[in-house]
């Protein structure tokens, strides 16, 4: 059997990490089995769907490296196909028109709640006579179209993640609405469950891979596949992504969309890697840092967990830091440029080679790309504010003297690491202090703090940027004070 899977997001918001994780699993399964990965945009919710959300979804999937083989297909362009399926169900007696008003349905629900019963439609219009239908139409009532569900029916399937799943027809809430309310004799806008099934039949989807929150929909959809005379695909219901409290990750948890992660400085390789680990366990001997292409050679549902997957920021941060370390200096500079630009840093004033040296220096300490703004600030600033630990160091005996020696020996030409090492040795000897005093005093003067990246490399970069001399002069003045 040819594997054909799909991802079918609704453009009612930006690409959510849960939808993106589902896309990753679908993509991996398709690539593992040399199948097709199809993109479908379920945009029939006209009130909430927005073109900017569609753009965000497409851009997000591309950013993650999830290339699709067919699509994107848009449900709003396929309404005639859905209405034809609804008509087929009406003609075969498997669907009917229901004229209940919203007030009548709400009264039904209220009475059920009063009896501590789960709200459900009681199928009261399932077998209307032509005369009854005519009477409702004469009142000007519009009708939804409902699909008949036998309460005694057992719906079962072997799920690729959850093994055997069984639902009773009586647990599905009564006959299901498959088309919105419309005037007599017409078919209103088809609804989610009907449209999804028609699309999956038309696109010959072999495996439906989605979150476990769709299990109840699957039971309803299996009945629709059968009623339309189509083969039922295989299903895999993946675990939900949970927050640290064990509840489903939602917008209330803050960062949930792929564009949010992108703006925070996470790289697509890290996000895709981490999403694969959200519910899937690598094969024995496989490192947790892997590419999508590597995962696609071994991915299957035998290693997908049933239990919900808790979102672990520490794991994501570690993966992101590893991906950053894998980048070449030129690649990293290109990735960092948008974050420098957003922070108002004019990198055009600095040579490309200097920026690459800076990225090489700071890259190993970055967890996200946004970290570069704070960590690189002292290299772009025209002056620095001395922190308390730096002020204390500059007050140490010998600090002023060794800085004076370094300042006087500074070359007018480019400073190299070898020259910098020699200058330090000469300065501490001339000032009569230990090398540790010289190094700590130089750090305080150049960086304004006793913490920071490699001192000598930082010195070389600051000298090249024309900042070493004025900082030494300012530190000497502070030490005098």
Curated annotation (Swiss-Prot):
<keyword id="KW-0479">Metal-binding</keyword>
<dbReference type="InterPro" id="IPR020752">
    <property type="entry name" value="Glu-tRNA-synth_I_codon-bd_sub1"/>
</dbReference>
<keyword id="KW-0067">ATP-binding</keyword>
<keyword id="KW-0030">Aminoacyl-tRNA synthetase</keyword>
<dbReference type="InterPro" id="IPR000924">
    <property type="entry name" value="Glu/Gln-tRNA-synth"/>
</dbReference>
<dbReference type="GO" id="GO:0004818">
    <property type="term" value="F:glutamate-tRNA ligase activity"/>
</dbReference>
<protein>
    <recommendedName>
        <fullName>Glutamate--tRNA ligase</fullName>
        <ecNumber>6.1.1.17</ecNumber>
    </recommendedName>
</protein>
<keyword id="KW-0963">Cytoplasm</keyword>
<dbReference type="InterPro" id="IPR020061">
    <property type="entry name" value="Glu_tRNA_lig_a-bdl"/>
</dbReference>
<dbReference type="GO" id="GO:0006424">
    <property type="term" value="P:glutamyl-tRNA aminoacylation"/>
</dbReference>
<dbReference type="GO" id="GO:0000049">
    <property type="term" value="F:tRNA binding"/>
</dbReference>
<keyword id="KW-0547">Nucleotide-binding</keyword>
<keyword id="KW-0648">Protein biosynthesis</keyword>
<feature type="binding site">
    <location>
        <position position="251"/>
    </location>
    <ligand>
        <name>ATP</name>
    </ligand>
</feature>
<dbReference type="InterPro" id="IPR020058">
    <property type="entry name" value="Glu/Gln-tRNA-synth_Ib_cat-dom"/>
</dbReference>
<dbReference type="GO" id="GO:0008270">
    <property type="term" value="F:zinc ion binding"/>
</dbReference>
<dbReference type="InterPro" id="IPR004527">
    <property type="entry name" value="Glu-tRNA-ligase_bac/mito"/>
</dbReference>
<dbReference type="InterPro" id="IPR049940">
    <property type="entry name" value="GluQ/Sye"/>
</dbReference>
<comment type="similarity">
    <text>Belongs to the class-I aminoacyl-tRNA synthetase family. Glutamate--tRNA ligase type 1 subfamily.</text>
</comment>
<dbReference type="InterPro" id="IPR033910">
    <property type="entry name" value="GluRS_core"/>
</dbReference>
<dbReference type="InterPro" id="IPR020751">
    <property type="entry name" value="aa-tRNA-synth_I_codon-bd_sub2"/>
</dbReference>
<feature type="short sequence motif" description="'HIGH' region">
    <location>
        <begin position="9"/>
        <end position="19"/>
    </location>
</feature>
<dbReference type="InterPro" id="IPR045462">
    <property type="entry name" value="aa-tRNA-synth_I_cd-bd"/>
</dbReference>
<feature type="binding site">
    <location>
        <position position="100"/>
    </location>
    <ligand>
        <name>Zn(2+)</name>
    </ligand>
</feature>
<dbReference type="InterPro" id="IPR001412">
    <property type="entry name" value="aa-tRNA-synth_I_CS"/>
</dbReference>
<feature type="binding site">
    <location>
        <position position="127"/>
    </location>
    <ligand>
        <name>Zn(2+)</name>
    </ligand>
</feature>
<feature type="short sequence motif" description="'KMSKS' region">
    <location>
        <begin position="248"/>
        <end position="252"/>
    </location>
</feature>
<dbReference type="GO" id="GO:0005524">
    <property type="term" value="F:ATP binding"/>
</dbReference>
<dbReference type="InterPro" id="IPR008925">
    <property type="entry name" value="aa_tRNA-synth_I_cd-bd_sf"/>
</dbReference>
<dbReference type="InterPro" id="IPR014729">
    <property type="entry name" value="Rossmann-like_a/b/a_fold"/>
</dbReference>
<dbReference type="GO" id="GO:0005829">
    <property type="term" value="C:cytosol"/>
</dbReference>
<comment type="function">
    <text>Catalyzes the attachment of glutamate to tRNA(Glu) in a two-step reaction: glutamate is first activated by ATP to form Glu-AMP and then transferred to the acceptor end of tRNA(Glu).</text>
</comment>
<feature type="binding site">
    <location>
        <position position="98"/>
    </location>
    <ligand>
        <name>Zn(2+)</name>
    </ligand>
</feature>
<keyword id="KW-0436">Ligase</keyword>
<comment type="subunit">
    <text>Monomer.</text>
</comment>
<feature type="binding site">
    <location>
        <position position="125"/>
    </location>
    <ligand>
        <name>Zn(2+)</name>
    </ligand>
</feature>
<keyword id="KW-0862">Zinc</keyword>
<dbReference type="Pfam" id="PF19269">
    <property type="entry name" value="Anticodon_2"/>
</dbReference>
<dbReference type="Pfam" id="PF00749">
    <property type="entry name" value="tRNA-synt_1c"/>
</dbReference>
């Amino acid at each position: 059997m040819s594997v054909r899977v799909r991802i079918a997001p609704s453009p009612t918001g930006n690409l959510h990490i849960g939808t993106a994780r589902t896309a990753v699993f679908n993509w991996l399964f398709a690539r593992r089995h040399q199948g097709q990965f199809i993109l479908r945009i379920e945009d029939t919710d006209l009130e909430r769907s927005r073109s900017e959300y569609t753009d965000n979804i497409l851009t997000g999937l591309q950013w993650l490296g999830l290339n699709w083989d067919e699509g994107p297909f848009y449900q709003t362009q396929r309404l005639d196909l859905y209405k034809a399926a609804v008509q087929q169900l009406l003609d075969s007696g498997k669907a009917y028109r229901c004229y209940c008003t919203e007030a009548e349905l709400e009264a039904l629900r209220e009475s059920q709640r009063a009896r501590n019963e789960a709200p459900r439609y009681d199928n009261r219009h399932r077998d209307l006579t032509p005369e009854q239908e005519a009477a409702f139409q004469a009142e000007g009532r519009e009708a939804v179209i409902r699909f008949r569900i036998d309460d005694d029916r057992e719906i079962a399937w072997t799920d690729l993640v959850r093994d055997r799943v069984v639902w009773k027809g009586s647990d599905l809430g009564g006959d299901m609405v498959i088309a919105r309310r419309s005037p007599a004799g017409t078919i209103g806008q088809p609804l989610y469950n009907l449209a999804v099934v028609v699309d999956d039949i038309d696109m010959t989807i072999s495996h439906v891979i989605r979150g476990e929150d769709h299990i109840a929909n699957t039971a309803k959809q299996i009945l629709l596949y059968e009623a339309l005379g189509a083969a039922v695909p295989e299903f895999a219901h993946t675990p939900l992504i949970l927050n640290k409290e064990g509840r489903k990750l939602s917008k209330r948890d803050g960062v949930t969309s792929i564009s949010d992660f992108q703006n925070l400085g996470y790289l697509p390789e890290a996000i895709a890697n981490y999403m694969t680990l959200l519910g899937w366990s690598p094969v024995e001997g496989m490192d947790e840092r892997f590419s999508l292409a590597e995962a696609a050679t071994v991915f299957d549902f035998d290693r997908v967990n049933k239990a919900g997957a808790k979102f672990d920021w520490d794991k994501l941060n570690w993966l992101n830091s590893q991906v950053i370390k894998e980048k070449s200096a030129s690649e990293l500079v290109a990735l960092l440029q948008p974050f420098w630009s957003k922070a108002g840093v004019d990198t055009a004033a600095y040579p490309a080679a200097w920026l690459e040296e800076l990225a090489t220096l700071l890259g190993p300490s970055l967890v996200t790309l946004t970290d570069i703004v704070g960590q690189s600030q002292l290299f772009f600033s025209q002056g620095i504010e001395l922190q308390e630990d730096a002020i204390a160091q500059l007050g140490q005996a010998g600090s002023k003297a060794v800085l004076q020696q370094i300042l006087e020996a500074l070359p007018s030409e480019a400073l190299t690491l070898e020259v910098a090492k020699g200058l330090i040795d000469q300065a501490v000897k001339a000032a009569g202090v230990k090398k540790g005093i010289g190094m700590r005093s130089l750090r305080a003067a150049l960086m304004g703090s006793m913490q920071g990246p490699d001192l000598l490399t930082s010195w070389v970069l600051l000298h090249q940027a024309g900042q070493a001399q004025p900082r030494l002069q300012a530190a000497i003045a502070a030490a005098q004070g």
